[in-house]
Amino acid sequence: VPTVMVDSALFAIRELMEKDPTCLLYGQDVGKRLGGVFREAATLAQQFGDERVFNTPIQEAFIIGSTVGMSAVGLKPIVEVQFADYIWPGLNQLFTEVSRSNYLTNGKWPVNMILRVPIGAYGSGGPYHSSSVESVVTNIKGIKVAYPSNGADLKGFIKSAYYDPNP
């Protein structure tokens, strides 16, 4: 039975959280009540608690920018913006803080974070849930962008990104 993308993300994040107590997951609706808009975080809040898996306000600049502070105190956040269309308010933080920290500090302050941005999801999301933003974010120096085509690649990309000191 093939594993769908959503399950691959869930399994990868669960394995990372089981192995590393500094791993956090937060973002829009990933907490206990919903477990992600696509259920990609289902059961994680129950398993790891509200201190490690929690919802944030719908404030993408905060979600992305907070990873700088979380990394500075030794945590390794995995954050999610619900849909690619929603990333725009957070681009300033991604471009000016997250992407440059490791290089500006000569490796002293890496931002160990993963930013998950679901894109190309099933259904018809209309003009505000269906955009492709990769042509913009791939031009930001200092971050890596992965666009998996199957569940195995997604799981591998998440786990590889987690151990990379760059965002």
Model feature map: region roles:
Residues V1-N166:
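Thiamine diphosphate
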